[in-house]
Amino acid sequence: MNAVFLAAGYATRLYPLTRDFPKPLLRVGGKPILDWLLDDLAPTGQIARCAVVTNARFAPAFRAWSAAKAFPVPIEVVDDGTATNETRLGAVNDLRLTLEQLEMSGETFVAAGDNLLDFSLALFLDYFRAGNTNCLMRYEEQNEERLKKCGVLELGDGDLVLSMEEKPAAPKSRWCAPPFYLYKDLSAEKIAEALRGGCGADAPGSLAAWIAVREPTRAFPMPGKRRDIGTLESYEAVRALYESRG
């Protein structure tokens, strides 16, 4: 299985912390945010190739980090060539570029590099292996305004995703999909087809939504919480939470 971490954003809401330093490498609980995800995946033994896609501004920091990071396979860093938030490619284009440049295809785990989970990704992988579909995660969101900023799912029997809509004005349910995905057979060509077919380029959930209406996709009920670090306040809150755990 391939693993691709999306880390090409500019995290402008965390300035000045992230003006010249990538958000996924900010430290929480004594190590970079991205380390928590990688250290959780490593014991599964399922990752054959691993990549992080970033931008030209942050590529040197990621290359230094990857050279020192212990992981079962080399961590390949892809530079998408952008240098400003205004010229960013968007997560879906970054994913396409990564698969194309590294000649990756097949089973692929895709995740944002700036989220933390309080449960193991091994459970998500087990859920994926138990079926024969693509998979994403889901949690119930009660706050109407937060719902409108999420990827919202419409579900059928057996956790099957009937539809997914990014940032809907009128959410069809309270099921949100965070940026963690498992694809059975992903390729640069499939993503290019999605983009030609009207798939949004910015949010990674746009690709999941496009695929979900064309290929069977199930939604894993999250057994715990995820921590989305989007602002200085949320970063400080997550840091305090992890420090309180010792």
Sequence positions of predicted segments:
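Conserved N-terminal catalytic core of the sugar/cofactor nucleotidyltransferase
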Residues: N2-F5, R13, R27, K31-A111, ...
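Active-site metal-binding loops of divalent metal-dependent hydrolases
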Residues: Y10, G113-N115
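A structural signal for short hydrophobic beta-strand segments in well-ordered beta-sheet cores
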Residues: L25, V152-L155, A219
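Residue-level signal for inorganic ion chemistry
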Residues: L34, T98, D114, L153, ...
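A short, conserved beta-strand element in the Rossmann-like catalytic core
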Residues: N115-D118, R226
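Conserved donor-nucleotide/metal-binding helix-loop-beta segment in metal-dependent transferases, i.e.
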Residues: F119-L147
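Catalytic-core segments of class I nucleotidyltransferases/pyrophosphorylases
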Residues: L125-R129, D157-G246
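Conserved catalytic core of nucleotide-sugar-dependent glycosyltransferases
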Residues: E145-L162
